[in-house]
């Protein structure tokens, strides 16, 4: 039985619906694929199902090592129950290997290992193209407090350490990834926790032996076999054995 719920927000890859209890939301994973700030668009059947499973798997394990996040439980193929947070308007990117915009900006060769893991901040605004910003911008415009920045950086590096090992164990190199954070309030105090998703949509993942791309760059660069590559990531993690049978289910 399908129940209609109030839509709270719709982004490029997900929809947030009102949750069953106060302080909760339902996060629905769409099949929409976008790149270059939504200038390139397509529907990739089954992408939402795979990303839901991969993000569930990773968020559950991060919770287990003390990286608190918004994930509560998966509800069905496309949806998960999450904690409602006040999203910090920043994308936090951790880079291990030169790829994407950092290679272009700094004239680096794609695939070149960076001297150390580098954290970058981007202001979340599609109309502006998600510009890169500094800690000075973040505190000056009150997007986040200094302590929140420190907490986000510490969590991002912890996620990087864990995911680098997790993926290395299944023959995948974690090149870089993007995470988002949100505030949860407890009385007069708030703290930041990990939010959004972690999936091949938000990570650059290369096969360790061949450097074959297993992530959203396959869509960005018209390399083809996007769903097959996402499924391969899920298969190596032991989540799925084969491409999912797509069922357009869910609460909406």
Curated annotation (Swiss-Prot):
Entry's EC annotation: 6.3.2.6
SUPFAM superfamilies referenced in this protein's UniProt entry, alphabetically: SAICAR synthase-like (SSF56104)
Keyword Nucleotide-binding annotated: yes
Enzyme class: ligase
Keywords attached to this entry: ATP-binding, Ligase, Nucleotide-binding, Purine biosynthesis
UniProt GO molecular function: ATP binding; phosphoribosylaminoimidazolesuccinocarboxamide synthase activity
One Gene Ontology term, aspect cellular component: cytosol
Pathway: Purine metabolism; IMP biosynthesis via de novo pathway; 5-amino-1-(5-phospho-D-ribosyl)imidazole-4-carboxamide from 5-amino-1-(5-phospho-D-ribosyl)imidazole-4-carboxylate: step 1/2
Cross-referenced Pfam families: SAICAR_synt
InterPro entries the UniProt entry points to: SAICAR_synt/ADE2_N, SAICAR_synt_PurC, SAICAR_synth, SAICAR_synthetase, SAICAR_synthetase_CS
Catalysed reaction, written as an equation: 5-amino-1-(5-phospho-D-ribosyl)imidazole-4-carboxylate + L-aspartate + ATP = (2S)-2-[5-amino-1-(5-phospho-beta-D-ribosyl)imidazole-4-carboxamido]succinate + ADP + phosphate + 2 H(+)
Membrane-spanning residues: none
PROSITE patterns noted in UniProt: SAICAR_SYNTHETASE_1
GO biological process: 'de novo' IMP biosynthetic process; cobalamin biosynthetic process
Family per similarity comment: Belongs to the SAICAR synthetase family.
HAMAP family: SAICAR_synth (MF_00137)
Protein's recorded name: Phosphoribosylaminoimidazole-succinocarboxamide synthase 1
Biological classification of the source: Bacteria, Pseudomonadati, Pseudomonadota, Alphaproteobacteria, Caulobacterales
């Amino acid at each position: 039985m399908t129940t209609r719920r109030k839509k709270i927000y719709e982004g490029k890859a997900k929809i947030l619906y009102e949750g069953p209890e106060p302080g909760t939301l339902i996060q629905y994973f769409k099949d929409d694929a976008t790149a270059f700030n939504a200038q390139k668009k397509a529907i990739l059947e089954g992408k939402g199902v795979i990303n839901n499973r991969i993000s569930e798997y990773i968020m559950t394990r991060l919770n287990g090592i003390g990286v608190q996040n918004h994930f509560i439980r998966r509800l069905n193929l496309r949806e998960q129950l999450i904690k409602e947070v006040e999203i910090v308007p920043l994308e936090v990117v951790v880079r291990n290997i030169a790829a994407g915009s950092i290679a272009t900006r700094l004239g680096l060769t794609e695939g070149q290992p960076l001297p150390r893991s580098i954290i970058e901040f981007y202001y979340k605004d599609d109309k502006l193209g998600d510009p890169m910003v500094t800690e000075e911008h973040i505190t000056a415009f009150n997007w986040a407090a200094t302590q929140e920045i420190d907490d986000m950086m510490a969590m991002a590096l912890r996620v990087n350490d864990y995911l680098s090992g997790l993926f290395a164990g299944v023959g995948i190199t974690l090149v870089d990834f993007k995470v988002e954070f949100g505030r949860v309030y407890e009385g007069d105090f708030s703290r930041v926790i990990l939010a959004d998703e972690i999936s091949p949509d938000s990570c650059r993942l290369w096969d360790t032996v061949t450097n074959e791309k297993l992530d959203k760059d396959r869509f960005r660069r018209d390399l083809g076999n996007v769903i097959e590559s996402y499924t391969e990531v899920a298969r190596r993690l032991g989540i799925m054995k084969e491409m999912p049978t797509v069922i357009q289910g869910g609460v909406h």
